Regions:
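Secreted/periplasmic proteins
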Residues: 2-6, 17-128
Length: 128
């Protein structure tokens, strides 16, 4: 029975490492990644608060939050209904509302849609 334990342990370690995945570490390796879904924008109360990467949120800068894209990634966000687009830099994590794929700064959102709508359908594409 004792000789089987090391064999089972080795098989388990091999299985676990074979099933693991790694995500790209830099924005460039995500280039071409695309996703379609709802975008919203930051409320005014978040002005001058720290983002997940330590920067201060400024509503007049073209920045955004995404759940998994690396910080510093440049992303083209296109409003599906009117074709307008804006390039933003990922510097925060979120959104944490079901169905939303990106949170935009207020100025970025305003450049492609009307803030009174609250959320719009967008396509996002990592450009670098």
């Amino acid at each position: 029975m004792k000789p089987i334990l090391p064999l089972l342990l080795s098989a388990l370690i091999l299985f676990v490492t074979a099933c693991s995945t790694t995500q790209p570490k830099s924005g460039g390796s995500w280039a071409g990644y695309a996703e379609t879904g709802q975008a919203s924008y930051y409320a005014d109360k978040y002005e001058n608060r720290k983002t997940a990467n330590g920067e201060l949120y400024k509503h007049n800068l073209n920045t955004a939050a995404h759940k998994k894209l690396p910080f510093g990634s440049n992303v083209r966000v296109t409003n599906v209904s009117n074709g307008k687009s804006v390039v933003v830099k990922i510097n925060d994590r979120g959104p944490f509302v079901k169905g939303r794929i990106i949170d935009l700064s207020k100025s970025a959102f305003s450049s492609i849609g009307n803030t009174t709508s609250g959320a719009i359908k967008v396509k996002i594409e990592v450009i670098r």
